[in-house]
């Protein structure tokens, strides 16, 4: 519960930085009320998360707070990278992967490791369940990038092309810049240098370039690769097959989600 409260705090602040209108199909806190309310609500949720953490059995408090602090700092670092990348002309796939590992994947990794610590798992299993969380978390964010451009906004819960409007460097953008040639590359540069172009024009034009450069297919393959890495980590965990099946099911749901 502490991790979920912390996660929702990050979403409140993330929506402010992205100036997002919708979250899970509903108006964001800063849009419904204002930025100050959203900031203070997020701050309070951080404190509440720690209050929940210390209710754990005393023998586990120190190690789980260490894990919690590590991924909390990572999430903040990842968000800063995300904001920095918006003003950078080029971002490599390696830089982007590092950013989403920090911003998204470390949260899932840490949540699973906290559960393993409380379950008194051996160190090797704590490591492997963390690797599972990291890789499935990266796959989750890559899937999020796809859904932003290609998902149904009524199902996804966000406006289509929000990342495109904000000039965010997603895996689709990075691959498109690598693959595009001629007029497509020139148009892509122009689209990502403006913040004033009407979204109704910009979004479909950029998605057309994504289609022309086959980045959707490349991203789907990349997601599949991280999914397979996650499954490999599950196999290394020394627990009963029925318990592994729970993790496999979670991974499969993430892979097939549309929201």
Please place each PLM-identified region on the residue numbering:
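All-alpha prenyltransferase/terpene-synthase fold signal
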Residues: 1-259
């Amino acid at each position: 519960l502490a991790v979920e409260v912390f996660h929702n705090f990050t979403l409140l602040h993330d929506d402010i930085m992205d100036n997002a209108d919708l979250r899970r199909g509903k108006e964001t806190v800063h849009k419904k009320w204002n930025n100050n309310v959203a900031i203070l609500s997020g701050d309070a949720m951080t404190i509440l998360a720690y209050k929940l953490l210390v209710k754990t059995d005393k023998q586990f408090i120190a190690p789980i707070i260490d894990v919690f602090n590590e991924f909390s700092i990572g999430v903040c670092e990842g968000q800063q990278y995300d904001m920095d990348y918006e003003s950078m002309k080029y971002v490599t796939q390696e830089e982007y992967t590092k950013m989403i590992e920090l911003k998204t994947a470390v949260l899932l990794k840490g949540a699973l490791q906290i559960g393993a610590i409380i379950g008194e798992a051996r160190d090797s299993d704590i490591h492997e369940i963390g690797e599972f969380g990291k890789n499935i978390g990266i796959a989750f964010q890559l899937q999020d990038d796809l859904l932003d451009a290609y998902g149904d906004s009524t199902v996804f819960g966000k406006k289509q092309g929000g990342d495109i409007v904000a000039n965010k460097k997603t895996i689709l953008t990075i691959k498109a810049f690598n693959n595009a040639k001629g007029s497509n590359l020139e148009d892509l540069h122009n689209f990502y240098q403006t913040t004033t172009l009407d979204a109704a024009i910009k979004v479909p034009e950029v998605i057309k370039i994504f289609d022309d450069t086959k980045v959707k297919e490349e991203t789907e393959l990349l997601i599949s690769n991280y999914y397979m890495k996650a499954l490999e980590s599950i196999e290394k965990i020394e627990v009963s097959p029925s318990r592994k099946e729970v993790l496999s099911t979670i991974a499969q749901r993430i892979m097939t989600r549309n929201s």
